[in-house]
Amino acid sequence: MSTRESFNPESYELDKSFRLTRFTELKGTGCKVPQDVLQKLLESLQENHFQEDEQFLGAVMPRLGIGMDTCVIPLRHGGLSLVQTTDYIYPIVDDPYMMGRIACANVLSDLYAMGVTECDNMLMLLGVSNKMTDRERDKVMPLIIQGFKDAAEEAGTSVTGGQTVLNPWIVLGGVATTVCQPNEFIMPDNAVPGDVLVLTKPLGTQVAVAVHQWLDIPEKWNKIKLVVTQEDVELAYQEAMMNMARLNRTAAGLMHTFNAHAATDITGFGILGHAQNLAKQQRNEVSFVIHNLPVLAKMAAVSKACGNMFGLMHGTCPETSGGLLICLPREQAARFCAEIKSPKYGEGHQAWIIGIVEKGNRTARIIDKPRIIEVAPQVATQNVNPTPGATS
């Protein structure tokens, strides 16, 4: 995969100091309410929440509600289920077009975590910052919308509506909806002892985008310049941006091919938080143990140099539009990892076996000294794919 031409504000008649990420104080899915707080807030919704499976012509129609990536609701007309999710994030990169693509990929990822590969409809939720000038709004927001639209089209769906409001911070998100037969989705609750855990995107996106901003902040750059070069940071940033914009659709399809038992996507709670949430949903008495952490090259060293302020080694560092964490039969996992790299799926797809499923009490943990897998950037050095609509 090639790098994009860097977004140049002056090409859009904007001040050269324009930065999209300055229109928010939080980044990406770092906006999530902490898990323990969220669970308390949702208690009243869960008290009377009917979540038992239903029957249709003798077949079980699964139901999934509050607590996981999507809802799965059996429809009144029988034999079909509504699978739906909503999500939104704040700007994490300064390229508006790519930010739109990332926001769309992030919404769709919740469907893909269910093994759903076809989305019937999308809505876009857009918060336009009231701190933007008219020129900034009129130049930047259409690029974001175009990126969102293009990613939706790549996913085989379309944006048919939504809501746009004024807000102090820019907000980007949407709703993804599909109607499925039971064989078109995989319930996230069937992991068994002996399964292995597979991850389909490297960790460290939040670190990469943060340290990229530090290039302009000498007091912060001085903390890490002995462990990373400016070129390392630029490559990690480009790799993070491309990974976040990449759909998890291929992995969702391969979940069916290789008999996945459960999955979730890795976003604002970090890999450990999402692994713990997935473990709680299991029907069997199992626990997840993570031994390996695939991380964007040099970002583990950066995290350590910062006193692990990002929580990367502890698995608590937020990710935005991260990969899928999939429970696969041991005998299928290596084949999954090999297949997803096939050129027929396009460039950039990767996967790693990172842990095991063992008999336990529905918890997840990372071992004390996990193996760090340094994931080299796949982006090329040339610049291609300029942002649509730029003036020369």
From Swiss-Prot:
- Residues holding Mg(2+): 69, 110, 265
Q: Which InterPro entries match?
A: PurM-like_C_dom, PurM-like_C_sf, PurM-like_N, PurM-like_N_sf, SPS/SelD
The name this protein carries in UniProt is: Selenide, water dikinase 1
Catalytic activity from the UniProt record: hydrogenselenide + ATP + H2O = selenophosphate + AMP + phosphate + 2 H(+)
Task: State the function annotated in the UniProt record.
Answer: Synthesizes selenophosphate from selenide and ATP.
Q: Quote the gene name from the UniProt entry.
A: SEPHS1
Q: Which residues form the active site?
A: 31
Report the EC code(s) recorded for this entry.
Answer: 2.7.9.3
Swiss-Prot/TrEMBL site (Important for catalytic activity) positions: 32
High-level lineage? Eukaryota, Metazoa, Chordata, Craniata, Vertebrata
* Recorded family membership: Belongs to the selenophosphate synthase 1 family. Class II subfamily.
Asked whether the UniProt record includes Cytoplasm among its keywords, one would answer yes
Q: Describe the effect of residue 274 to Y.
A: Increased ATP-binding
